[in-house]
Design a protein with these regions (language model features):
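Conserved N-terminal segment of class I S-adenosyl-L-methionine
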Residues: 1-105, 115-118, 197-202, 210-214, ...
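Residues lining the SAM
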Residues: 105-108, 134
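Short, glycine-/aromatic-enriched active-site segment of Class I SAM-dependent methyltransferases
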Residues: 131-153, 157-163
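Conserved S-adenosyl-L-methionine
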Residues: 168-179
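C-terminal helical/coil "lid" or tail adjacent to the Rossmann-like core of SAM-dependent
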Residues: 180-209
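Core SAM-dependent methyltransferase catalytic element
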Residues: 186-192, 222-234
């Protein structure tokens, strides 16, 4: 795994505007007040989820170059003024930091010790605050591409629940992108491709995601290649 490879992946998936808008609509109501986005990358997700109504939106990113790029976007107005770029991890935040929402969008699977990570995150949540996690689903869909971009795992409902601190109460746990899951199965069994091309990302985002947006509710969000979990601190 290289940082340039991961950077290429981030730039590719930054074009997945339908996908970001889809999950954004599901979680947006939880993103108010003081928000911490862990692993903010190049700011592509921040641009979709942060609409400027929040009191503070901390873009926490361990890669110094990516964190600097986020700071540039704040300064040039690409990101709302409530955004704040910080270089580091949750372990670097001090006791004064408390958040109404903590968001992991395609990040937790990159963290080797996810149990310890989420315990620290729970400490940073205010009472009644929300933890929001979106990650790749189903370990049986794990491919060499997952390993190349630094994924330690993919999650099922069971495996994700096992790493959530017991002091958090489950609000929602579901799967998203049922049509994309079928495409992923086809890729794993037939194509066996590694890094997706820009054309493949565009096809998935423009053709398959609209279908998933229609079909997922009909399936009660029981199938999908991504898992979404929301918990509240009580």
């Amino acid at each position: 795994m290289t940082s340039s490879y991961i950077g290429s992946e981030l730039h590719l998936f930054s074009k997945a505007t339908n996908w970001k808008a889809y999950y954004g609509r599901v979680i947006k109501k939880y993103l108010a007040g003081d928000v911490l986005e862990v692993g903010a990358g190049i700011g592509a997700t921040s641009r979709v989820l942060c609409d400027g109504s929040q009191r503070k939106w901390v873009c926490l990113e361990p890669d110094a170059a990516m964190s600097a790029a986020i700071q540039e976007q704040i300064e040039d107005g690409s990101l709302p003024v409530c955004c704040e770029a910080r270089n580091g991890t949750v372990a670097d935040l001090n006791g004064a930091d408390r958040f109404d929402a903590i968001v992991y969008i395609d990040v937790l699977e990159h963290i080797e010790n996810d149990v310890d990570e989420l315990s620290k995150a729970a400490d940073l949540l205010k009472e009644a605050g929300h933890l929001v996690i979106l990650s790749p689903a189903h370990q049986w869909l794990y491919t060499p591409f997952d390993g190349e971009i630094g994924h330690y795992r993919r999650y099922s409902k069971k495996s994700l629940l096992e790493v959530i601190p017991p002091r958090l109460r489950r609000v929602e746990l579901c799967y998203l992108d049922s049509v994309g899951m079928l495409a992923s199965i086809g890729n794993k069994m037939l194509l066996k491709s590694s890094m997706p091309t820009a054309g493949q990302i565009s096809f998935w985002d423009k053709r398959l995601i609209p279908l998933s947006m229609f079909i997922d509710p009909l399936l009660l969000r029981r199938l999908g290649k991504s898992i979404l979990g929301i918990w509240s601190k009580t």
